[in-house]
Structure formats: C-alpha cells, structure tokens
Amino acid sequence: MLMPPDHCLLATNHCLLPTFPHLSSQILYILTTMLGRVVFYRVFGRLEILFAMLVAAVFCACNNDMSRGDEALRIGDYDRAIANFSKVLDGEPANRDARYGLAIAYYAIAEDKERLKENTLALWERTAREFKILTAIDSSDKVTPLYSTTLFYLARAMLAENEHARVMRLLDESIQLDPSNYFSYNLKALILGGQGDVDGAKKIYAYIVTREPKFASAYVNLGNLYWNAHDYESAWDIWSMGHEALPQDPVLAKWTRVAEDSLKAMVYSGKL
C-alpha cells in the first residue's frame, strides 16, 4: 500500500505515530516522548481503575455476606449465619462484626442443644474459641459477659463427659471476665464441696446469696452442706431464708418443709 511521500509511520510504544521530515530530530523526540507518556498513563490509569473495581467488588461481596449473616442470625438461621460470617472472615480474619456474629451463632446453637439435653461439648469448645479470638480484636467489655457464660457452659459440658475433668481454671477465668457470673461461682463451690473443701464451698455460697439474694441454687447447695453434716438447724435457717426470698421456688419450699419436720421430730424425741 502506497503512503504519501511526506508522511510515514513510526512505531512507538506499540502505537503508530505520524512523523514529519521537516521537523528537527529534537522536536520529534520531545513529541514522541510526550505521546508515549500519554499512552503510558492511559494504560496505567486503566489498570488503576480495574484494580479499584476489583477492590470494590470484593468489598461489596464482603458487605453482602455480612448482611446475609446478620439477617440469618436475626431470624434464627444459625447454620446459614455461620456460613456467611465465615466467608467474610476468610477474606478479613480480624473483622470484628463478623467474628462476633460467628461466636453468637455458635453460642445460640449450643444453647439450643443444651435445652434438648444433647451433647454440647464440641459446640462450647468452638464457641469459646471464637470468643477468645474476638477478645484479641475487641478489648471492650461488650463481649466479656457472653464469653464468661460460654466458659461456664464449657466447664459444665466437660464435667458431664468426665466428672473428674479439670475445670477450675475455666471457672476462675469466667469469674475474672464477669465477677457477677454467679453460675460459675456456684459450680466452683459444688466442686470444692465434692473435693472435701466444705469451708471453701460455704464461703462461696454465702458470698453468692449476699450479692444475689434470689440465686436459688446457692441456698439449696449451702443448706445441703449443713444437712449432710447433721446440722439440721443451720440447714433449715438457710433453706427457709431462701424460701422467704423465693416463695415460688419448689425445691426450696420442699427442703424447708423437710427440715421443719425433722426439727419437730427431734424436739418430740428429746434430741433437740
């Protein structure tokens, strides 16, 4: 193909640029360099745009997964909540909201199985793991009460599997996280009493009923310690105190009557 004699094509930066023989070589160099830079920045700019679009797509996908996880959690679809929060964490392991949602979903599943009296050890272990990771991300007090309760449930599940399981460390950590978690105090006192540390158990039960006068189990368990030691008067004192604080509690009502009947029998027999 013939080209005009005063107009040829020069290949620069993979683009065909026109040259003009009557222009000096210096001017031509400047022109071609400038045009090359324009082409370079156009290509580079397109790469930046593509990268930005990719980041936006990933961010949008994460947001969608997060939204779906929140919605699933709200309606009680915990398996789907776990799946969506896990997708977010695959791309962003330190995402606080996704980690919190995942921990809550595992907690809810484990709690549901507790009500059905099913084995929950593996679920509480996983829940505790998620809360532990969460505390490394979020140092606020928002997560500590649930983490504390999780450790209580984990200790109880371990004891259900093996009555000799070492759970004191878990209970102490639970109490440290939430000093108002009287369930952990109560379980710790039960273990101490079973190990023969009756005085230690009594102190914990007394602490519980002083701080939380409507904690029925502490009254029942403290009364049992006195009853087993044949101190029926003290047992009646504790149970009746609990019955007064919680008149609708059937267990306290029952043992208060039992203690009263025993004391009356002892009076009639001259043993008291």
Report each predicted region and the residues it spans.
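Helix-start (N-cap) detector for alpha-helical repeat units in TPR-like alpha-solenoids
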Residues: D65, R96-D97, D141-V143, S148, ...
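Structural marker of alpha-solenoid helical repeat scaffolds
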Residues: G91, I137, D141-V143, L177, ...
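Canonical tetratricopeptide repeat
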Residues: G101, L146-Y147, Y153, L187, ...
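Terminal, low-structured helical/coil segments at or just beyond the last alpha-helical repeat
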Residues: N228-L272
